[in-house]
Amino acid sequence: MTAFHSPRLFLSLSLLGLLAGCGGDPKPAPPAPVVVGPAPTAAAKPLRIGIALGGGAAKGFAHIGVIKMLQANGLEPVVVSGTSAGSVVGALYASGMDAFQMQQAAVALDETSIRDMRLFSGGLVQGQALQDYVNAQLKNRPIEKLGKPFAAVSTRLEDGERTVFVRGNAGQAVRASSSIPGVFEPVTIGKFHFVDGGVVSPVPVDAARQLGADFVVAVDISSKASGKNPAGMLGIVNQSIAIMGQRLGQQELARADIVIRPKVNDIGAADSAQRNAAILEGEKAALAAMPQIKAKLAQLQQQRAAAAKAAQPAAPPCEPRSRLGRLIGRDDPCKKQE
């Protein structure tokens, strides 16, 4: 007679005997249990880089150099806002042009073709030629049909309110954003009149945030008071606007993640002959800021990843093995999670 020296073996054989003695048709096996594990970790969404391009008349060619260096380093802005000259470059960039195409367009630009000089009650330049030029470059697409989200910032003349154009006629929005008071005729849109956005938002950081940018690179090309008389009427008006918007501008710039300041103070507001020099200064300034940009982006990405991980639901509590499970030697799932 064989003795059962192992209670575990005895119990297993007893269970087999009971199952074998059961008559009737075999019942279908129940479905396999579903194992619920911890939810997969959600990857942090890629950061949306925005660029806010400030006003500065002919100094605005520097924006092209900044964009060129960002693209060369794989940091493509996907959101664009612009004030005055920044709105011109911003619209071209948002339309799908890269920095090299914009530079070609800048070099080929005949300045007289966008200056419809006539004596109007509100300014020396009507601005229709600028509007037509921008729309031609954009193939007459409205703002909402451009390749990237774009905002042109202007000032409503009736009450001084900042106005952000994100839909409609792109050329008209750029014209409104660029209508330097006393030089350009105010632009009539609906029942309101609009002038240069630099009066209320010299570098439109907030507009870039409103478009969904997580990380904003601001480009400040505004004139700084040098103690000297600015040259020409346009220089005087441009510096006057910069002084008026200086305090507001500093507050808004503080909300940017990075501020790039190309050294373009020596370039006159109307000195379009130095467009290549301005582009080069933009490249230099962006290249100098690149280590800081990359470090801040990496830091923000780490913060986002940590926040996404912390937001994941905790794993469901394990169920300890039953008495029968212990008898037949089933592994304890709770010990595996320890």
Residue ranges and their predicted role:
Residues 2-9, 13, 22-80, 92-338:
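Patatin-like phospholipase
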Residues 87-91:
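Long, contiguous secondary-structure blocks with strong helical propensity
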Residues 82, 86:
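Gly/Ala-rich beta-loop-alpha elbow adjacent to hydrolase catalytic centers
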